[in-house]
């Protein structure tokens, strides 16, 4: 059971974010949100997937994540890439890439929820663009692993709170084809 459900952006802040990124004024009724609290998955991979799908349309993000689950297309790893295998850049110029299948499945469920929320609000799903995606650390589940000779080792499990905010944009602003943004942050 989730302990709390707090979006990091209010409706007014989401409207301002859309105006800053796309130069388009939208109302609060043109924004759809989805939140998945306390998911048992990797926080680092969740951050990379959230950063990657931000700026895509809903259809583009879902098709890319479905390809990740099928192990056809990877997710670029930009921040958490120390001691990772660097490939000979077969994927559009990023040497570090992974296929986070478990995280992609959870994000697909979240995007399905976002699509249903957008339909419920009466938005055109073809013009819905993900304007904000974030993964925050949730609480730790504390476990104990018994060891030999009466000892015990603490075994913690990290949870992740994931949020996605999307807005319906005018047709001329919606990205036709997603261009990979390879700028390092």
Swiss-Prot record:
GO terms for cellular component: cytosolic large ribosomal subunit. It comes from the Archaea. Keywords: Ribonucleoprotein, Ribosomal protein, RNA-binding, rRNA-binding. InterPro entries: Ribosomal_uL22, Ribosomal_uL22_euk/arc, Ribosomal_uL22_sf. The keyword Ribonucleoprotein applies. Pfam families: Ribosomal_L22. GO terms for molecular function: rRNA binding; structural constituent of ribosome. The keyword Ribonucleoprotein applies. GO terms for biological process: cytoplasmic translation. CDD domains: Ribosomal_L22. This protein binds specifically to 23S rRNA. It makes multiple contacts with different domains of the 23S rRNA in the assembled 50S subunit and ribosome. The globular domain of the protein is located near the polypeptide exit tunnel on the outside of the subunit, while an extended beta-hairpin is found that lines the wall of the exit tunnel in the center of the 70S ribosome. Belongs to the universal ribosomal protein uL22 family. HAMAP family: Ribosomal_uL22_A (MF_01331_A). Part of the 50S ribosomal subunit. This is Large ribosomal subunit protein uL22. It comes from Pyrobaculum neutrophilum (strain DSM 2338 / JCM 9278 / NBRC 100436 / V24Sta). The lineage of its organism: Archaea, Thermoproteota, Thermoprotei, Thermoproteales, Thermoproteaceae.
